[in-house]
């Protein structure tokens, strides 16, 4: 079980800050909390079989916003509010049974259920004057978006080892999907005249069946081959997609410590992850394929070299290139489409490329272990209906990425952990020009929020570099009955780097406009407890 305490620890400080800022006509709201619960129970039935049950619950909540209001009796009362709430989480439950048939074959059958849902609510409100006066004006907009998916699955996997040179794996998977692609509720009020409309709320069911097999074959002491094939069948809206996914990797052991590996893999994916281009949030939408939207197809090749130095250190360098087809993304200006337009009509299909190289160095023995990894990467997209058909960088076109991870086992009861992450910032789409509505006469300090934004290119701005330090301590508490309790105290983003997730335009009462970054996650302490029995 793990729970963050940032919301409880920061509440008094935020209250004091808002009390100070009240005289300046400002108020801020911020809250982030997450809860994780993991439960795993294994039961050893006999020497040949065992059963297990896994349960996971994860829930995140994020709220932030600000308000500006009049101070004093000598000016006309006004208030501008802008708040957002996000909630997302997973529930997963699985139960399995493993059985050893003989010394050459064993298998596992698993039943699984998972549920994911994300909710996003944005609320803006403004008023100027005193209600009842002829100059009084007000506006309120609240938009709620919901997306979710439920999966029920049965999996059967078998391992067969006929000889020391062959390890054959095969099996079958069945999944029943229940999608809620998009539900939008919008409440508006203009000068106390409320309206409400909802769109979406469509439920889609899909059936996915797959059979697969692979063989890990040591042809000789130098050459080892892993070959696999997966047959997929996916049915939705009375439409059935069939695909064949082959993969092949070959390893050459040049010396006892040096090896080369090359691989090829083809994949078809039947659920698309769609994200807004103007910010990076964990509440991206999960959309299914349909009669109109085809499965994502990808082909990837890679080649790498791997070197072991004694038993303590290992080094690797690997290059890859990935081609993607039938990628989905929101069309330009999709948010201006009429409310009755379905979720499929907001999406465009295109292609993409991802390529780069990764370098990793590991220390795997001793009291201090860890690894350092660096990646140099490119990722591009191209859609006929986006960016005037021109190729553009993907949202996650992070050119450089560096990870440093270290673990120090002080003794059998105490362990320290640390990791530092650095990467080039994500890309977002920002409009640098706005054409205001003709004839609009705003009354200070209410500013015109309408007009038409002009976007020159998709993902035209790169956010500042992302970096953070995570620290943790594990305290092991052995029990007399052989059970083990583990306390974990960790700090996410230890030096409180406020990494931006978007850039947005702000206005002030003199009608000047400026851009500012929005950051969400500061330092987050958390405590977890694990009990093994």
Can you describe what each PLM-predicted range is?
Residues 4-9, 413, 422-449, 464-470, ...:
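C-terminal beta-signal and adjacent terminal beta-strands/loops
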Residues 151-153, 199-204, 210, 290, ...:
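Outer membrane beta-barrel strand-and-loop segments of large Gram-negative receptors
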Residues 149-151, 161-167, 173, 200-324, ...:
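Structural signature of Gram-negative outer-membrane beta-barrels, strongest in the C-terminal barrel
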Residues 1-86, 326:
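Periplasmic-side early beta-strands and strand-to-turn transitions of outer-membrane beta-barrels
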Residues 321-323, 341-432:
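Gram-negative outer-membrane beta-barrel transporters
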Residues 1-3, 53-59, 109-115, 170-176, ...:
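Transmembrane beta-barrel strands of outer-membrane/channel proteins
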Residues 117, 185-186, 257-301, 321-344, ...:
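Surface-exposed extracellular loop regions of Gram-negative outer-membrane beta-barrel proteins
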Residues 42-60, 84-238, 253, 316, ...:
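Face-selective signature of the C-terminal outer-membrane beta-barrel domain
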């Amino acid at each position: 079980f793990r729970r963050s305490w940032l919301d409880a620890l920061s509440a008094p400080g935020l209250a004091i800050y808002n009390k100070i800022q009240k005289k300046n006509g400002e108020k801020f709201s911020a809250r982030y909390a997450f809860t994780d619960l993991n439960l795993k129970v294994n039961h050893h039935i006999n020497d040949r079989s065992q059963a297990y049950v896994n349960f996971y619950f994860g829930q995140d909540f994020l709220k932030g916003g600000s308000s500006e209001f009049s101070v004093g009796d000598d000016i006309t009362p006004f208030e501008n509010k802008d708040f957002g709430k996000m909630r997302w989480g997973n529930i997963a439950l699985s139960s399995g049974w493993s059985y050893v048939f003989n010394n050459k074959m064993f298998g596992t059958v698993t039943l699984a259920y998972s549920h994911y849902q994300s909710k996003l609510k944005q609320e803006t409100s403004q008023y100027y004057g005193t209600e009842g006066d002829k100059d009084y004006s007000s506006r309120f907009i609240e938009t709620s978006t919901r997306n979710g998916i439920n999966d029920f699955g049965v999996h059967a996997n078998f391992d067969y080892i006929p000889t020391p040179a062959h390890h054959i794996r095969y099996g079958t998977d069945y999944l029943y999907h229940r999608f809620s692609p998009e539900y939008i509720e919008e409440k508006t009020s203009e000068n106390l005249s409320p309206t409400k409309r909802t769109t979406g709320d469509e439920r889609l069911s899909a059936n996915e069946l797959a059979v697969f097999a692979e063989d890990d074959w040591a042809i000789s002491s130098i050459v080892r081959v892993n070959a696999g094939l997966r047959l997929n069948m996916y049915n939705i809206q009375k439409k059935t997609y069939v695909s064949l996914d082959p993969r092949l990797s070959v390893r050459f052991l040049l010396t006892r410590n040096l090896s080369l590996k090359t691989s090829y893999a083809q994949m078809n994916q039947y659920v698309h992850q769609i994200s807004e281009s103007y910010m990076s949030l964990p509440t991206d939408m999960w959309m299914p394929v349909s009669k109109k939207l085809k499965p994502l197809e990808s082909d990837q090749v890679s080649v790498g070299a791997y070197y072991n130095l004694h038993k303590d250190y290992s080094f690797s360098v690997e290059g890859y290139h990935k081609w993607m087809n039938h990628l989905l993304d929101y069309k330009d200006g999709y948010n201006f489409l009429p409310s009755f337009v379905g979720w499929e009509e907001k999406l465009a299909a295109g292609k993409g490329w991802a390529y780069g190289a990764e370098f990793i160095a590991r220390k795997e023995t001793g009291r201090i272990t860890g690894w350092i990894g660096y990646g140099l990467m490119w990722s591009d997209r191209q859609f006929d209906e986006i960016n005037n058909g021109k190729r553009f960088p993907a949202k996650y076109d992070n050119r450089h990425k560096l990870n440093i991870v270290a673990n120090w086992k002080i003794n059998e009861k105490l362990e320290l952990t640390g990791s530092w992450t650095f990467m080039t910032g994500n890309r977002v789409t920002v409009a640098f020009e706005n054409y205001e509505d003709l004839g609009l006469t705003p009354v200070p300090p209410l500013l015109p929020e309408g007009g038409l934004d002009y976007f020159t290119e998709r993902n035209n701005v790169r956010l500042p570099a992302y970096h953070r330090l995570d620290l943790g301590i594990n305290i092991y508490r052995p029990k007399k009955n052989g059970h083990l309790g583990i306390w974990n105290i960790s700090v996410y983003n230890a030096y409180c780097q406020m990494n931006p997730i978007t850039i947005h335009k702000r206005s002030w009462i003199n009608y000047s406009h400026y851009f500012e970054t929005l950051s969400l996650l500061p330092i987050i302490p958390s405590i977890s407890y694990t009990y093994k029995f």
